[in-house]
């Protein structure tokens, strides 16, 4: 295993904006509330919130969530903004931030109906991954989810994380016992993973209807 040199220190993430070709990640703010509440309560909300820590929000609970989330430094929330029209299509966060060890996790992901399973979702993840490895220089990027959450587990593998095991009876969430599946990505793995993302996200990989020509997962399987 080719470990990279360990730094003497790692910086904590800052509330900055990250811009891609289709989406931008910006610090979560009250101005994103209307769009986020609409997508949080749109058709299929029960499915989107099934494995999140929160329930489908009411106006009151959403207001309290936004107050806490906008002020939080860990998790550090961002809104996912579609550059085409400036709409907020989802949110995600960097969390379990551990500068002493150069370890960080992506989580609290809520991608709305217009964004989930699209090129925009892939780019939103990629922007955070680039920030974690290329800007902060962290050693380890984590993804974890309920072991029953099939879509999240498939997404982790598609994005290049490696499955590392299950913590049994790890949490109690919404009154139920949760076994947690853990996934990790390491700094020395990132350069090759990044190349596959860049090729997949390039305009040449999409036809006139916006459909992908090659799958991201197919490329990552060869690593």
Predicted stretch roles:
Residues 155-156, 183:
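Conserved active-site tyrosine of GNAT-family acetyltransferases
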Residues 121:
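Glycine-rich acyl-CoA binding loop
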Residues 143-152:
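Conserved beta-strand-loop-alpha-helix junction that forms the acyl-donor binding cleft
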Residues 158-160:
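Active-site-proximal glycine-rich helix-loop-beta segment
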Residues 134-144:
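Conserved GNAT acetyl-CoA-binding A-motif
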Residues 1-118, 131, 135, 176-181, ...:
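GNAT-family acyltransferases
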């Amino acid at each position: 295993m080719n470990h990279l040199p360990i730094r003497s220190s790692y910086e904590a993430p800052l509330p900055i904006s990250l811009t891609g070709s289709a989406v931008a990640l910006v610090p979560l703010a009250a101005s994103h509330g209307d769009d986020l509440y609409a997508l949080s309560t749109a058709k299929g909300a029960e499915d989107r919130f099934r494995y999140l820590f929160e329930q489908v929000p009411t106006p009151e609970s959403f207001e309290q969530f936004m107050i806490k989330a906008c002020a939080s430094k860990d998790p550090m929330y961002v809104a996912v903004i579609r550059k085409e029209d400036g709409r907020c299509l989802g949110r995600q966060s960097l969390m379990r931030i551990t500068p002493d060890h150069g370890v960080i996790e992506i989580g609290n992901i809520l991608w709305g109906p217009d964004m989930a399973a699209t090129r925009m979702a892939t780019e939103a993840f990629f922007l955070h991954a680039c920030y974690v490895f290329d800007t902060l220089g962290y050693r380890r990027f984590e993804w974890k989810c309920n072991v029953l959450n099939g879509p999240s587990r498939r997404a982790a593998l598609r994005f290049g994380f490696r499955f590392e095991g299950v913590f049994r009876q790890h949490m109690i969430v919404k009154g139920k016992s949760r076994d947690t599946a853990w996934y990790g990505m390491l700094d020395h793995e990132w350069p090759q993973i990044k190349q596959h993302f860049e090729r997949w996200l390039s305009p040449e990989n999409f036809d006139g209807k916006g459909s992908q020509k090659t799958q991201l997962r197919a490329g990552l399987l060869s690593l």
